[in-house]
């Protein structure tokens, strides 16, 4: 749960 900024 959180920001998916570093999801590739």
Swiss-Prot record:
The keyword Secreted applies. The modification Phenylalanine amide is found at residue 8. The keyword Cell cycle does not apply. GO terms for biological process: neuropeptide signaling pathway. GO terms for cellular component: extracellular region. It comes from the Eukaryota. It is found in: Secreted. Keywords: Amidation, Neuropeptide, Secreted. FMRFamides and FMRFamide-like peptides are neuropeptides. Belongs to the FARP (FMRFamide related peptide) family. This is FMRFamide-like neuropeptide GGNDFMRF-amide. The lineage of its organism: Eukaryota, Metazoa, Ecdysozoa, Arthropoda, Hexapoda.
């Amino acid at each position: 749960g959180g920001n998916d900024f570093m999801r590739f």
